[in-house]
Structure formats: C-alpha cells, structure tokens
C-alpha cells in the first residue's frame, strides 16, 4: 500500500511559515521596526496606506551593503546568530531570519539601503526572496523597506482581517509598546500621506508614558531603577551572577491614578513587550488593598536580563518566553513595587498637583498649585521624624510640617492603614469571657465566621455564642456589631480590613501632639502609606513653592507697594 504521507512542496512550507510570522498590518510594522532598532536607528518613520495594502518603514540605522541586501530576504538568513549556542546569547530583537522572506511570500518587497561611506542600493525581491532587480540609488545612510500588495496571494487572509480602523488601532498599539521599551527613539507615523501621530524621545519610559496617556501629570508616576543580581543556576551553561540585572519600574501612584481595566499592566524583557501572566499577577498582587474596588494599577516593568536566563524560541512573534527562576524574579518585582510605593525623607519634599484642590488657590491666583502626595523611596525604621505634627483641624485632620512644606493627614484612614498592615502581619484571636451572644445567624453567616477563625457554637434557640474575637476588637463596646459585620462574607483580608476600620481612631476624636506624632511615625513606616485598604487617599501635600506663589513672596517690596 502506497504511503499517504508526503513532503509538502516548498512554496506551501514557506506560506505556512509566513502565516505564523505575518498575520496583519501590525505584524508587518513590528517586524520591520524591530529590524530598524537592531540596526541602531534612533529615528523611525512609518508610512501606511491601508486601502492599498502598502507599508513603508524608513530609519537612520547602519544600513546594509550590497552583499547583505541580496541575501536579506533569503529563507532562514540572519546576521543575528550563527549556531544553536547563540540561541542563549540573543541580544537583538530579531534572530529567526524569517520576517523578510515571509513578506516576499505574501507581498511585493523593495529595500533601499546605504551603509555609511558606501553607495546606496535598491533591491526588489521575488516570491522566493531572491533579488530580481538591483540598481544603485541615492539615499542617506539608513534603510527604507516598502511592502506592497500585502496578502495579494491570499485573498482569504484579507477577507478575514478586522476593519481598517481596528487594524490601524493595532498598529498604533504595537508602535507604542515598542516605543515604551525604547524611549530614546523618535517616531513619526503617516497614514494615507498625512501625519497620523508622533512620539518624541524621552530619557525614560516614565517620561514617555504621558504622551500616550495625556490625562496623566508627571507627578502621577513614580519611576525606579534597580540593579539586582542574577540568580544562581548551576543548570545553565554560564552563570553570570556577577552581571547584575537592571529592573526598571514605572508605577502610577495608587492615590493618583488607576484604570478600569488591567490594560496598563505591562511587562517587557530585554527591549521587547511580552505576555507573562505570572509576572502580571505578581504586579496585581503587589497593589492589592491599595486601590478602590474593581480598579487596576498602571505599571510598566522592564527587565534587562542576561540572555541565558531566557528562552525566546517559543513563539514566532516572540511574545511568549520561558524565564528561568521565575519565582526569584517575582520576588524581586514585589520588593521593587513595595519600595516604590513607600514614603521617606529622600523624596518627601517632592509633590504633585491635584486638580480637585488646586481650584481653591485659583480663586486668589490663576497659577496657584495645591499639591498632593510626594513621591517615594525606602522607609526608615529609625525614630527620625520626617513629618512633625503641628496641629489638629476639626478633630479629623493632622497638620504635619516637613522641610519642604506641609501635609494634611486624615487621622482615621491613616490609622486604618497602620492597623490593617499589623493585622496582616499578626492576625491574633483571643478568648472572651463571657462569650458574645448573637441572635438569628444564618448558616452562611456561621460558616463565614468559622472560616476566618472564630470559635462559635449554638447557645440556645436562634442564639449563638462567639468565644473568641480579633484582639483589636477586645476593648470596643460594639463587638457584637463588629462580628455581625464580619459574618456577611469575604475572605480573611476582607475581615482584616473591616476590623482595622472598626478599630481605627474615629474622626472627631481629639488627639494630643504626642499621639498625633506617634500616628504619623507609625503610618510612614507602613508598606503602602498612600491609600487606605479601600483605596482612598490618606493625605494632601502643600509644598513650599506653592505657598510662595500663593502669597507672592517673590515680589519685590517696592513693586508690591506700587512704588
């Protein structure tokens, strides 16, 4: 019986491979732009003609000589790697040698390029990636790649693509993600011969993000850059413990900005945005109980890791990777986020403006600024007072002074944050005698109280006896009401939040200066001092520069008197 298994024709193999790499306008832009960045370009111009199925990418990179141009679109041809060992030494964005050849399978491709001190060349490629037309041409150093008649040989592919508007939205998102990983690059994007959008270069990703989210203000974001050692792994061929990893982190301060969706929880490794559910969940967990309900953080994590820690060869688009020692990196990310969200003297003077409160000062001065929330660094566990308690307003707010201005701290939610973190670190139940009697609990309420550790049993008809309770509730007169509140559902952390809220000092309670100072000191040492466990902001900041502008302290005396 003849075999039914046959080798596929070469053109079918190439078509299958091309479909894995190039599936949309965004994929074309991604592959060409990554080649530009690998060539050292710091200025990239993208032209799009979606109705004509044409894309052009021009850059000021190193360019190519004629020999490289003639080989550039050949199958499995690349300048990035030479052997299998190089798969663990990848420093470039591309390495597979598939993109340009795939494009010649699906479209008409032309490349014009010039290396410095060489003449420029124009090369047109055929379906198999071979150069069919070569001629000298005038061009500045760099490369221009034009892809025309995209998917002309695959009519079904064109029909299956989303609408033009959706494809252009995907292109914009792709360019923004790449720009975020390479903030020093200048971008200009044209659509149908009209400028569509530009991205100006920035020193860091944190300075670039406001171009994508214009509603943000610079002080809404906190950026940190850390050098951390690579983990020891004897299974790897090389062990670069001596070479540190760079961890760059940009977070939206939880009292300043958050999102309806987790669309800005982003992870990049070695210059490429990736999908890493594990690291994304680590980020979300680090912001737990710092944001309002059903809100998500703004966070961009970029790791520059030794290449031997990563396996890129898992997905043609290289968005999915295998990262060695994942738990180690998760721990480092958690520590970095915690460090970023804290408050210390190092940056207590820095603050940002809030629209809500700045209106108060605008009544007297159009440019007045009322500021909110300083940026952060490591907390200090010593007794140095970064904030000095000065007074209490309405038995609710603590006026605190520091070298750069003053803060207004809401005493109840500041104390709530302190107590909540203490409960998280030490959830302690103590026996009570006589027991607390509750009336008419449902089976679900009984099960909930038992779930969080309370000892409860039947005391009579429709009566239940609670024989222990959280230590913080021991001195309260409303213990029964507090336990009833705990019985209405939620996990242990929900119960801890409820206990902290019940136990915190109430607004309207007078406090002495030593009591206020003690609360300020305890609050500054918390892990997440910016918001209460419900996500509400804890303090307002009014810095010295705002006060000076408001009271016009920089005026010359003679001029202020009309002299």
From Swiss-Prot:
Classification via SMART domains: DNA_mis_repair, MutL_C
Keywords from the UniProt entry: DNA damage, DNA repair
Any one cellular-component term (Gene Ontology): mismatch repair complex
Top-level division of the source organism's lineage: Bacteria
GO BP, one annotated term: mismatch repair
Record Gene3D superfamilies: 3.30.230.10, Histidine kinase-like ATPase, C-terminal domain, MutL, C-terminal domain, dimerisation subdomain, MutL, C-terminal domain, regulatory subdomain
Molecular-function GO term, any one: ATP-dependent DNA damage sensor activity
PANTHER family in the record: DNA MISMATCH REPAIR PROTEIN MLH, PMS, MUTL (PTHR10073), DNA MISMATCH REPAIR PROTEIN MLH1 (PTHR10073:SF12)
Similarity-based family: Belongs to the DNA mismatch repair MutL/HexB family.
Function: This protein is involved in the repair of mismatches in DNA. It is required for dam-dependent methyl-directed DNA mismatch repair. May act as a 'molecular matchmaker', a protein that promotes the formation of a stable complex between two or more DNA-binding proteins in an ATP-dependent manner without itself being part of a final effector complex.
Protein name: DNA mismatch repair protein MutL
Protein source organism: Trichormus variabilis (strain ATCC 29413 / PCC 7937)
Gene coding for it: mutL
